[in-house]
């Protein structure tokens, strides 16, 4: 499987068959299924390689996970019509949305089509989807923590979105009902 190729040397130090667990893999793109009390919807999102986002709900709250996503459509940017926005159905009304925000708006100009989002496009996507709380993730590995904090401060000062938004950080815990 594709996952077996990624979870093997040289990309990953351990072979998938050597993991200390009973692992069952399923193809789940563009599907709906349940695991215990959780209803899960998966769907392809715009990215050069096959990439899936997830919507997980428990009847009380919804968490949407879209880590690799470019919602803008080239020079047109984000078309504010939910029928044309990749990932919209996954993110609509989410209580918590974790979304790709790898670039600043300026950096994104030279990286269109790479499959990642600017923080500005991620915020616009979240706003159009009426997400309540957004975690900006998939930070550019060339940005230091200090640079990320500075970039986020500039973004917040220039973009007063009505939803709660913050940078995703290692070790964060967020409670959903």
Task: Briefly describe each language-model feature range.
Residues 1-77, 87-88, 145-177:
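Binuclear metal-dependent hydrolase catalytic cores
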Residues 72-164, 168:
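Cap/insert and terminal regions of metallo-dependent hydrolase folds
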């Amino acid at each position: 499987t594709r996952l077996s190729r990624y979870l093997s040397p040289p990309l990953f130090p351990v072979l998938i068959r050597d993991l200390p667990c009973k692992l069952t893999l399923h193809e789940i793109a563009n599907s709906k299924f349940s695991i215990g009390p959780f209803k899960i919807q998966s769907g392809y999102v715009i990215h050069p390689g096959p990439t899936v986002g997830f919507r997980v709900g428990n009847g009380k709250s919804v968490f949407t996970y879209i880590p690799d996503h470019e919602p803008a459509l080239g020079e047109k940017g984000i078309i504010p019509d939910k029928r044309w926005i990749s990932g919209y159905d996954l993110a609509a009304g989410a209580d918590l949305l974790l979304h790709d925000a790898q670039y600043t708006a300026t950096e994104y100009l030279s990286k269109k089509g790479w499959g990642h989002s600017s923080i500005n496009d991620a915020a616009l996507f979240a706003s159009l989807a009426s997400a309540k709380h957004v975690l900006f993730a998939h930070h550019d590995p060339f940005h230091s923590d200090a640079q990320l904090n500075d970039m986020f401060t500039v973004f917040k000062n220039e973009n007063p979105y009505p939803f709660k938004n913050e940078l995703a950080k290692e070790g964060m815990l967020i409670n959903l009902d």
